C-alpha cells in the first residue's frame, strides 16, 4: 500500500482559496483543523457542491419536470445480470441488477414520473405500489415480491460553467449531472478520469505540474466533444421518450421496432447510448 495516500474519514472542507500555484484547503475533523496546500484539487462532488459555491462556480440548469422514484425491489425470478429499461407514458423505468440478498432476487429501480404521479406513488400502500410498478415493468422477472424504502428527487440537467481553473478540475456530477434515461453519467465520468490521467502523465513527462492550465486545458480539449455528444444525446432521448405527442410516439415506436429488425442499427444505437461513438 502506498504511504503517499492519506484517507481522511469524517473530515469536512471548511474553506477553500486559490493561490499562485494551486489551491489551499482548510479541513476539519472533530476539534482538529489544518490546511492542505494542493497543486491540483480534483473536486469529485455532487451536483450541489458547497465548494463550487464558495469558489463562485455557477451552473447551467435545466429542469425536466420529472421526479425519479428509487428503491430496491425483489422479484420472483433471477435477473441473471441483465439490466432492463421500459419507456412508459410518463418517462423511462430502469431496472438494474443487484447482488442476491439471502434468498431475494434484487434489483434497483429508477422510475421517472411526473411530479403529481410521484406524490401518488409515495402515498401508496405496498399492495397498490406493487400493482402499479408491475403494470409499468411487466413480468419479465416474474412477480414483484417486495419493494424497499422509496426515495424521490427531481430530475434535471446541471452543467458547470467552468470545469477547470489553475489547480482545480471538476469531475463527475459536479461537472455534469445528466438525466438517467441513458445511464451515461457514470460512463462519461470514467472517460473524463481516464483522459485527465493521460493529460497529467503527459505533463509529468514534459516537466509540467499537474495543476498547470496547459495540462488541464489539454484534458478539456480532449473531452469537450465527448461530453457535448453524450449530454446532447441524453437530452434528446428525454424529449423523445417522455413525450405523449402523437408524432413523437410514432417516431418512438417506429424507431424501437427498427432496432429489432436491423441489428446494425441496434448496435449503432447501443454504442451511441454508451457514449462509445
Question: Which residue stretches match the model-derived regions?
Answer:
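Structural motif
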Residues: 19, 89, 164-165
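Pyridoxal 5′-phosphate
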Residues: 18-22, 79, 189
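Conserved FAD-binding catalytic core of PHBH/FMO-like flavoproteins
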Residues: 26, 30-35, 40-150
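A conserved short coil-to-beta-strand element within the FAD-binding core of flavoproteins
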Residues: 9-23
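FAD/FMN-dependent oxidoreductases across multiple families
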Residues: 119-211
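N-terminal Rossmann-like dinucleotide/flavin-binding domain of flavoprotein oxidoreductases
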Residues: 1-6
Amino acid at each position: 500500500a502506498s504511504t503517499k495516500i492519506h484517507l481522511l474519514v469524517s473530515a469536512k472542507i471548511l474553506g477553500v482559496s486559490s493561490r499562485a500555484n494551486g489551491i489551499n484547503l482548510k479541513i476539519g475533523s472533530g476539534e482538529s483543523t489544518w490546511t492542505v496546500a494542493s497543486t491540483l484539487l480534483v473536486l469529485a462532488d455532487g451536483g450541489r457542491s458547497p465548494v463550487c459555491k464558495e469558489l463562485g462556480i455557477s451552473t447551467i440548469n435545466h429542469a425536466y419536470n420529472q421526479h425519479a422514484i428509487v428503491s430496491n425491489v425483489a422479484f420472483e425470478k433471477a435477473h441473471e445480470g441483465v439490466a432492463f429499461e421500459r419507456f412508459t407514458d410518463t418517462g423511462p423505468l430502469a431496472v438494474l441488477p443487484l447482488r442476491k440478498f439471502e434468498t431475494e432476487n434484487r434489483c434497483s429501480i429508477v422510475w421517472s414520473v411526473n411530479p403529481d404521479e410521484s406524490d401518488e406513488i409515495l402515498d401508496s400502500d405496498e399492495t397498490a405500489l406493487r400493482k402499479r410498478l408491475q403494470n409499468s415493468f411487466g413480468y419479465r422477472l416474474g412477480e414483484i415480491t417486495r419493494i424497499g424504502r422509496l426515495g424521490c428527487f427531481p430530475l434535471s440537467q446541471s452543467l458547470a460553467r467552468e470545469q477547470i481553473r489553475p489547480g482545480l478540475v471538476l469531475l463527475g456530477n459536479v461537472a455534469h449531472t445528466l438525466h438517467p434515461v441513458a445511464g451515461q453519467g457514470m460512463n462519461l465520468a470514467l472517460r473524463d478520469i481516464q483522459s485527465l490521467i493521460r493529460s497529467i502523465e503527459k505533463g509529468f513527462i514534459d516537466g509540467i505540474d499537474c495543476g498547470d492550465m496547459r495540462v488541464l486545458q489539454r484534458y478539456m480539449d480532449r473531452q469537450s466533444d465527448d461530453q457535448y455528444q453524450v449530454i446532447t444525446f441524453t437530452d434528446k432521448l428525454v424529449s423523445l421518450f417522455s413525450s405523449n405527442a402523437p408524432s413523437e410516439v410514432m417516431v418512438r415506436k417506429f424507431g424501437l421496432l427498427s432496432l429489432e429488425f436491423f441489428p446494425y442499427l441496434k448496435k449503432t444505437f447501443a454504442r451511441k447510448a454508451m457514449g462509445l461513438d
